[in-house]
Amino acid sequence: MKNRNLKQPLMFVLVAAGLAVPAAAYVGPGAGFAFAGSFFFIFIAFFVAIFNFLTFPIRALVKFIKRIKTLKYAKYKRVIIIGFDGMDFHLFNQFKKQGKKFPNFDKVANQGTFNPLLSTEPPISPVAWSTFSTGANPGKHNIFDFLTTDRNTYMPKLSGSDIRPPKRNIKIGKYTFPLSKPRIELKRKSKSFWKIVASKGIFTTVLRVPFTFPPEKFSGLMLSGLGTPDLRGTQGSFSFYSDKQGEDFDISEGVFGKLEKTENSENRYKGKIKGPVNPFVKGNVPLEQAFTLTVSRAEKSALIKIGKETYKLEQGKTSEWIPLHFKAGMIKIAGIAQWVLEDVGEGRPIKLYLSPIHIDPEKPVMPISHPRIFAVYLSKLLGPYATLGMAEDTWALSERVLSEEAFIDQVYTFHREREKAFFDSFRKCKRGLIVQVFEATDRMQHMFWRYLKNSGSPADKPSRESRVVDAIYESYRAMDDFLAKLLEKVKEDDLLIIVSDHGFNAFNRGFHLNSWLHREGYLVLNDGKTSSGKWYADVDWSKSRAYGQGLNGIFLNMKGREKYGIVSAGKEAETIKDEIKKKLAAVKDEEKKQDAIKSVFKREELYRGPYTVNAPDIVVGYNVGYRVSWESAVNYVSNNGGALFSDNVRMWSGDHAFTRDAVPGIFFCNKKIAVNDPTLMDISPTVLSALGIKPESFIDGRDLQVHK
């Protein structure tokens, strides 16, 4: 990195010393976090690099000795773990029964093993991938949902990472200068299997495993996956621009920007890109970068000028990665984004989409890899690439800001980037462990399940294009194509394991869990209120005994735990939990004449370990077709004319927040195994055993006993 690229962050520490805004209502780490670690990250990395350089000979010798001791017991030269997020065992077999071909999956199955893979309870990505990573049940790794609850505010917060603002600040007029640095903490507990492997001196690379942000420090290479924020500090906020007013469009998410005509021009417009919050100014004021857009309706294209650079946009096509820079004084923060000119037709409003602004991997302002230089190295190898955890913009598709075709293009663009990164790392791994998760299958199933025959989805299915209608099958086939390239390189003394964290099924009806808790008297509203706004805006906590949080959880309002808790531990709490369990188990969707809920668990019935106390008090397991409603997921207590269920008409029509036996994942291995009922928990001890390492005592999973 050139010295001039370091000067601005180095100057920044003199006045900013790291800044973060507490978790905001959209449940991101907090807008403004792009500045949170920008200098401290580089400053500390600089001195760590010097220390590492000076101590390298000693560390290399120790690592070599450990490696020699371990490898003499290893059964395989390389262990390769591939994750296909959300690939469903039943759907895979259904495709095969329809005559669809997966020759490379078949090759692995015929040579070794193909089984369903039991997920976690609930079978959702943060819980499942954390169990995969550690081999431990959630009571030992501390991840129970996408969200957990802030006991002081009852607001949701991300379960996987904790962003804490500086403890000390100094205010001078309208400016604020932090005097201490922010803290970024990975909330997952227990050791990952790759950390154990790397500690034995074995070369280890981990790419985009979900819930690895911030990347843990270990003697290997890591690029963080799901959970990594965008430059605004959110989990992915797109922008939408038009020459019409925002109220002309039905958009509830994202950032709307008005395109204003410039003087003396009929086809030139100006707009502003909203960046991270300015850390020096009160009021959460975002930094901005201006752009001009010159449209050609006849050619269905436009020229967009950002800074000194001009780029051509063609209607319906995704742009290249375009660099963006936001300045706060002398500090410049780098991001990258993609544009899609969705519509510039004659007589129609201009529709311009801007992706979430990704952290620029060439100049990362917060830790997205370990070591930091690894993300930079990949950018030199690949060019700009997606760094946001949930890079595929499902919200923009749901809001109809992004077309189905453009979304599919986006998914495969990111998939190709990840393939390139994987094969580069694979080529360098002559002996050791490499782990990679691909996410195209998950994203396609979430958004296109409605197109499957017999899905029963009430959601809109506007397309007749085979690329859209068959998007899920095509994503499975794309994974088979990837496997073809990999199998050409896999040797006899390599162990290949392919897994998914869960399967999939239809999400057709939403259950208003918080409305049910209100109706049953557990969640009480302020006097005169029959419904509550977002984030429990109108709840009377002094009278409430229970509330929903996340996709599957219910928390009691406990004395001494929640700020306004009223439920006493012991008999009272157990009585309430027993009541809720019994009543929920009897809930029926009267309109559809179906049971909505398959099982209800107390947390102690599912989890064991020191972090069980952080789990929801009750975990709800939904029947296929049902899930917590979109309203309850963001803490509305909705009236809905008394209805407890509503159709899910969003494009997000597939899901997996059911019970784990309803959505098994897939397990492939190029060797036979002795166990015929593998679980996600078993992957960690199996990998350790294959590399000659005894699994540690905290691990709950079994060694699958791979046959040599």
Model-derived features with residue positions:
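Short, structured active-site-proximal loop/turn typified by the sulfatase FGly-forming signature C/S-X-P-X-R
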Residues: 92-143, 147, 205, 524-525
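A short beta-strand-to-alpha-helix junction
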Residues: 185-188, 477, 525-550, 566-578, ...
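Active-site-proximal N-terminal segment of extracellular/periplasmic enzymes that hydrolyze or transfer
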Residues: 64-113, 699
